[in-house]
Amino acid sequence: MQRRAGLAVLSVLALISAACSGSSDDAAPNSDAPTVAEAPTTDPPTTDEPIENPPATNAPDEATQPSLTDSLAVVKPGFVISPGVEQVSITGATPGSTISIVTTTMADQRMPVGAVNAPPDGGEVDGYGSFLFRNLDATTDWRLVVDGASITEPIDVLARDEHPDPAFFAEQSLAPGVNYIEMRDGTTLSANVVLPGPIEDGPYPTVVEYSGYTPADPNGTGFKDLFTPLGYAYVGVNMRGTGCSGGSFRYFEYVQSTDGYDTVEAVAAQPWAFENHVGMVGVSYPGISQLFVAQTQPPSLAAITPFSVIDDSYNSTLYPGGILNTGFAVKWTQDRVDNGKPAITPTGEIIETGGQGWAKDAITAGDDVCAANQSLRMQNPELVAEIFDSPFVDSSDNTDGLSPRLFVGKINVPTFIAGAWQDEQTGGRFPTMLDRFTGTDKFYVSLMNGLHTESIGPANFPRWVEFLDLYVAKRTPTLDTARVIAPILASGIFGTGELALPADRFAGMAYEDALAAFEAEPSVRVLFEEGAADGTAARTPLPRFVEEFESWPIPSLEATEWFFGNDGSLGDTAAETASQTEYLALPDGIPATFLAEESAGNSGDIWKLDVQWDWQQNAPGTAANFITKPLSETVTMAGSGSADLWVQSSVGDTDLEVTISE
């Protein structure tokens, strides 16, 4: 964020209406299937071979110059072409050669003599022999031009809704340990399968965690240690272009969503997966990914539990309020760029910097698939540079595709979403999209004050277990095992002592009765004053009280208006005369972070009970302050707010932050 000192002037005619964590890895067939989705399975030829009977072309007339197909040899290329969802990847090509892509129409077009055709898109093959074309129209046939001397036959790319036949997934077998799941374009994703017992004792209710972190790391810790004691099979899957997964990584491009579809279907097809359906779990990144995957409507997806999520990548996280989020979003993105770097050189030597450590360990131990899957990593885009180059929302750059609020209406499975308004990583805007989940009538919400991990705190954990038991395991919920796990979870994340979970609410009920009772409850639960429960230490992640509502926004909510007064007052009527107030905008006048030095070394410390804060009030004259008279009755602010301001600044750019407090 660029910091400027300047004089900001606010008109008093203003109206207020109130109604992840990502850390770097080393820190801790069938005939109905679309044949275009199959990558070559044999070694490619090492030289370009002319096609025996190339398509006939007419000689150009005198008024035109030859087309590309007139003038270039049509060949079978000496590399692997893998058409994917709106993509074409090239592997095994000669490093340094040039590859361009043109539409078949462009390739066949004869231009008037002297005219210049539009230059094809493309570039130079990288040192790994790879190149990737993105954002291709699936309704168009494409051809590759190699070194300006030869051209391929037409290539069909896959549309977003061209899903494989179920037989494609049924033919894949996954066993406990590290596996590779094949996607519709031939890319393989690394997956770690952990079962709660012997495979012959299955089937087991199954959950999938899917992200660009390290869920497929067999030696990592995380949700696999949480769900297997609860009786669930756990499958952690690395997104393409991360860890040991093949392909190239770009933040939530659509192929990651269809990869999620393929992952769900492949896992659900396993004989050890209960009822051949799976649920999805995850907080933050693997929570957000559930929204992207569920929009594709995988037939075997039972339910999702997206916790600590965003409603819009740009407005909630990258540029909240139009201000670049250098505190979290830029660093998080840089971590993803670094994690997505190749683990090995083109000749197979381990690269010390970048990449994911567990992938390097796997390659060193002889995992040849992991090694081969590093080949497209140099095609990962420079995401941080794109952020700085895109300070404004532009739907033509696919920002709409990165906005869950625009597609959550497509989600048609039971959904349980939870999060906190003061989430320091993903922000507090996600409740603004809750009324957009119109595709499912099994929709449950837990809202609370607090930070990023509050959603999996002990206050919400029992409801999470109940939801998964009812909609994935399809059994009467019990918290017996959860009572053992919850204190360990709370201690590790929040630094708490012993915490007791409530009694089983559905004890003695048949499954159908428990499900009916759960569905009869209000769907929205708000945990008030989290961290201030009576009889507990300060900041213990428990609420003082809980209220339930039928929907969000709360139907009985009444919008409240407050007006700035001439004398620094805040009242329910507008001032009769206009005036203004001035302050010196001095961003450097307060600390860049509100953590004390002893708590600033580890980002996880912010969630602990003993966190030390260093919150400082703005110095006199560096903020405009307005205050109400003492309220005559208790008022609860619930929902979104807005501030209408008329601003004049002595500098070209100034940031504004509006805080409502008591």
Segments (PLM) and residue ranges:
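A catalytic-pocket lid/entrance helix-loop region that shapes and gates access to the active site
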Residues: 255, 266, 281, 285-358, ...
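N-terminal cap/lid segment of alpha/beta-hydrolase-fold proteins
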Residues: 159-202, 627, 631-633
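Cap/lid segment of the alpha/beta-hydrolase catalytic domain
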Residues: 189, 198-269, 620
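Bacterial signal peptide processing site
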Residues: 21-24
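C-terminal, loop-rich substrate-recognition/catalytic regions characterized by aromatic stacking residues
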Residues: 458-662
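Accessory cap/linker subdomain of secreted extracellular hydrolases
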Residues: 292-411, 479, 499-504, 509-521
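C-terminal motif of bacterial Sec signal peptides marking the signal peptidase cleavage site
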Residues: 16-19
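Extracellular mucin-like PTS domains
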Residues: 31-58
